[in-house]
Amino acid sequence: MSFGSEHYLCSSSSYRKVFGDGSRLSARLSGAGGAGGFRSQSLSRSNVASSAACSSASSLGLGLAYRRPPASDGLDLSQAAARTNEYKIIRTNEKEQLQGLNDRFAVFIEKVHQLETQNRALEAELAALRQRHAEPSRVGELFQRELRDLRAQLEEASSARSQALLERDGLAEEVQRLRARCEEESRGREGAERALKAQQRDVDGATLARLDLEKKVESLLDELAFVRQVHDEEVAELLATLQASSQAAAEVDVTVAKPDLTSALREIRAQYESLAAKNLQSAEEWYKSKFANLNEQAARSTEAIRASREEIHEYRRQLQARTIEIEGLRGANESLERQILELEERHSAEVAGYQDSIGQLENDLRNTKSEMARHLREYQDLLNVKMALDIEIAAYRKLLEGEETRFSTSGLSISGLNPLPNPSYLLPPRILSATTSKVSSTGLSLKKEEEEEEASKVASKKTSQIGESFEEILEETVISTKKTEKSNIEETTISSQKI
């Protein structure tokens, strides 16, 4: 009875040492990181060692209990039956405990399988995330290509805008030059009109002078006719007087005085006729010269008027052409200004759209990074849970191996005692064969435990390396996003300054 109580206390204390409270152990294992996992592993090793020591002590107690020498030389059958009953009770209790442990072990194995499937799914998701994180270079290349295209379009728009501004400046200069020329032509037209008015005044004066001269010619002709008439009358009177005087003198001396008087009258008449002819000729020459001068002045005036009219007509035609050209240039300038305003509005709208798309991409990138960090944390937690379960499984394995060794040692100690009447009911042959096979596999299980410990160490190192690499990747992505944001801000400021 002392053996059963001792075995029960050792088994329960070893179970509590190894597992304790399930919630506390799972909280410690899930809350701790890589170093916590190693601490829990060392704790489980110490607990397993203590449980193994306890089981070995119980088995030694069993052996001592069975090997304790009796008071007499022979062993009583009643004591052997009591001991076998006690051993059966202990075995049934141990079987129940092992059944419960096997059930828990099966549950844990199923949970481990589920966690392994989740781990594989998370590894696939992590590989996809790594591939996606490796693909941001391609996404970044597409983004950079789109940015280059947008920058090229922006440069083309800015060059077109600068070209339009240059054309507008050239057209403005041409308009100013045409306006100056138009003003100059208008001033020339005004001067020509003033000269035309002056020429018209001169023509009016010339016509008035011609009319005056014509009147003077008519008056002179009338005067000449009057002078001729007076001259004829005087000649007639003189002839009459001469005839009278000749008749009077004839009476005195007809023969001597008559030839002298006729010759004198003839001379006087010739002198008057020559004087009248000279006066008429000089008057006609003066009239002809004056009329020719007036005609020449009138012809010059009419020619100047005609040239002035033609020049005025040409100036008017040029003015109309320049006005039409100015209107066309003004319309072209207004259309270019409208195009510039439309280009500026379109450019501002495109810049706003690109900034919105950049902000959306940055938000998507941040969400992707946070999702990657969350998946990595979940993966780390699952790795920690897997390591904790591996440690717990190793502890169960050590506990089972300790029980197997205890059973094997107890079987050996029982076989070393005096032979019982019927020892076949003490331990079934199936259990004995299982214990012997399990005892033979203890060395292999120890090797497997060492390999699992090394694998857990490698897994913890890999997880730490994955965490470090992920942190480096996060830092690189944050730095790259900051650089792209700075470059985008600088480009927008430069484009706004250019505008």
Curated annotation (Swiss-Prot):
Residues 88-129 are annotated as: Coil 1A. One of its GO terms (cellular component) is postsynaptic intermediate filament cytoskeleton. Residues 1-87 are annotated as: Head. The modification Phosphoserine is found at S72, S219, S335, S469, S496. GO terms for biological process: cell differentiation; cellular response to leukemia inhibitory factor; intermediate filament organization; neurofilament cytoskeleton organization; postsynaptic modulation of chemical synaptic transmission; substantia nigra development. Found predominantly in adult CNS. Belongs to the intermediate filament family. This is Alpha-internexin. The lineage of its organism: Eukaryota, Metazoa, Chordata, Craniata, Vertebrata.
